Amino acid sequence: MKLIVGLGNPGDKYKFTRHNVGFLVIDLICQKLKITLDKEKTHGSYAKFEDFIIAKPNTYMNLSGNFVLELANFFKIAPDDILVIHDEKDFELGKSAIKIGGSGGSHNGVLDVINKLNTQNFKRLKIGIGQNQEMALKDYVLQRFSLEEFSVLEPVLNQAADVCIQYSFNDIHYLMNKYNQKKKNGN
């Protein structure tokens, strides 16, 4: 069993903000698989599809680890079978990469997942949102994408959803090789 969790903030107010790219990818996965997140736990909603769980916390970003831990414990999923999708300010808009482990940097949602799981040993799908040096980070990540920015991001979100679906039946190293290399070549 594998767990795929998109990080974001709940509510329509945050739907198309930079911090919610993880939620946007989960929405696309559900659309592609024709499923809904129809099961509830204390800290979020999820769907079970074949041999994996797709989930979104209903807590704010900084408390995302509660739901990841709740699902990992309930379904007995090891941290190395968890994939967390999140925004990455240190990647330019449209860049993305799969990574195994490592620190959470300044991303409070990822830091909370690390803290709650008590390990960095889980997979991440990082999606670049870029930075704006003239704006405080907390304001920037809660800003909605412009139409121009979203047109750059949309194909990346679609590809990320496809990668997550493939994660359910492929080795992560195979996906990293294929996806990260493809992104480097611009194909």
Curated annotation (Swiss-Prot):
The record marks N9 as: Discriminates between blocked and unblocked aminoacyl-tRNA. The active site is at H19. Hydrolyzes ribosome-free peptidyl-tRNAs (with 1 or more amino acids incorporated), which drop off the ribosome during protein synthesis, or as a result of ribosome stalling. Catalyzes the release of premature peptidyl moieties from peptidyl-tRNA molecules trapped in stalled 50S ribosomal subunits, and thus maintains levels of free tRNAs and 50S ribosomes. It catalyses: an N-acyl-L-alpha-aminoacyl-tRNA + H2O = an N-acyl-L-amino acid + a tRNA + H(+). Its EC number is 3.1.1.29. This is Peptidyl-tRNA hydrolase. Keywords: Cytoplasm, Hydrolase, RNA-binding, tRNA-binding. GO terms for cellular component: cytoplasm. The record marks D87 as: Stabilizes the basic form of H active site to accept a proton. TRNA binds at Y14, Y60, N62, N108. The lineage of its organism: Bacteria, Bacillati, Mycoplasmatota, Mycoplasmoidales, Metamycoplasmataceae. PANTHER family: PEPTIDYL-TRNA HYDROLASE (PTHR17224:SF1). GO terms for molecular function: peptidyl-tRNA hydrolase activity; tRNA binding. It is found in: Cytoplasm. The gene is pth. Belongs to the PTH family. Monomer. One of its GO terms (biological process) is rescue of stalled ribosome.
